């Protein structure tokens, strides 16, 4: 559930000004980690990302440990970083964490020349990936949802 921008009454500019302040009062339930410019094809990395999305952190680590893919090693590092961020920055317990988002975006492509017959050349694209993993605390989601609803009521009452 996201904060709704009021249609009339409270001005949009005032809403956006207060938005950051209001959102900081909500309990922290998620942490993220991003690995950029990783030298692996996004298509290959997405296959691994799809297997761990929605799983508990322990289950995701087990899946990654037994996967023979190169992307699994990279994903494991990013997941470990997200869990460490959750513990250190927000004090979330590892037992309640699950992988809420895990996605792979395209990074830049390095273009290389591949010599072919008769003096021709083909261009080879070496692809890169940006990998993002977001972990959430299941036990605090209800608390977060209630706080968000209260905040929404507060904003709508100011209209």
Swiss-Prot record:
Keyword terms of this UniProt record: Ribonucleoprotein, Ribosomal protein, RNA-binding, rRNA-binding
GO biological process, one term: translation
Molecular-function GO terms, alphabetical: rRNA binding; structural constituent of ribosome
CDD domains the record matches: Ribosomal_L22
UniProt-listed InterPro entries: Ribosomal_uL22, Ribosomal_uL22_bac/chlpt-type, Ribosomal_uL22_bac/org-type, Ribosomal_uL22_CS, Ribosomal_uL22_sf
Keyword DNA-binding: no
Gene Ontology cellular component terms for the protein in this record: cytosolic large ribosomal subunit
Protein's job: This protein binds specifically to 23S rRNA; its binding is stimulated by other ribosomal proteins, e.g. L4, L17, and L20. It is important during the early stages of 50S assembly. It makes multiple contacts with different domains of the 23S rRNA in the assembled 50S subunit and ribosome. The globular domain of the protein is located near the polypeptide exit tunnel on the outside of the subunit, while an extended beta-hairpin is found that lines the wall of the exit tunnel in the center of the 70S ribosome.
HAMAP family: Ribosomal_uL22_B (MF_01331_B)
Family of the protein in this entry: Belongs to the universal ribosomal protein uL22 family.
Subunit structure: Part of the 50S ribosomal subunit.
NCBIfam families: rplV_bact (TIGR01044)
Annotated protein name in UniProt: Large ribosomal subunit protein uL22
Source species of the chain: Thermotoga maritima (strain ATCC 43589 / DSM 3109 / JCM 10099 / NBRC 100826 / MSB8)
High-level lineage: Bacteria, Thermotogati, Thermotogota, Thermotogae, Thermotogales
């Amino acid at each position: 559930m996201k904060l709704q921008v009021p249609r009339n009454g409270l001005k949009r500019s005032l809403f956006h000004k207060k938005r950051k302040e209001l959102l900081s009062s909500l309990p922290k339930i998620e942490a993220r980690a991003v690995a950029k410019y990783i030298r692996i094809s996004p298509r290959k990395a997405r296959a691994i990302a799809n297997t761990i999305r929605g799983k508990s952190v322990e289950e995701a680590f087990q899946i990654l440990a037994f996967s023979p893919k190169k992307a699994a090693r990279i994903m494991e590092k990013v997941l470990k970083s997200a869990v460490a961020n959750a513990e250190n920055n927000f004090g979330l317990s590892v037992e309640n964490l699950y992988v809420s988002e895990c996605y792979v975006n395209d990074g830049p492509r390095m273009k290389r020349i591949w010599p072919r017959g008769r003096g021709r050349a083909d261009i080879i694209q070496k692809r890169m990936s940006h990998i993002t993993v977001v972990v959430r605390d299941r036990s605090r989601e209800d608390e977060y949802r209630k706080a968000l609803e209260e905040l929404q009521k507060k904003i709508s009452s100011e209209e």
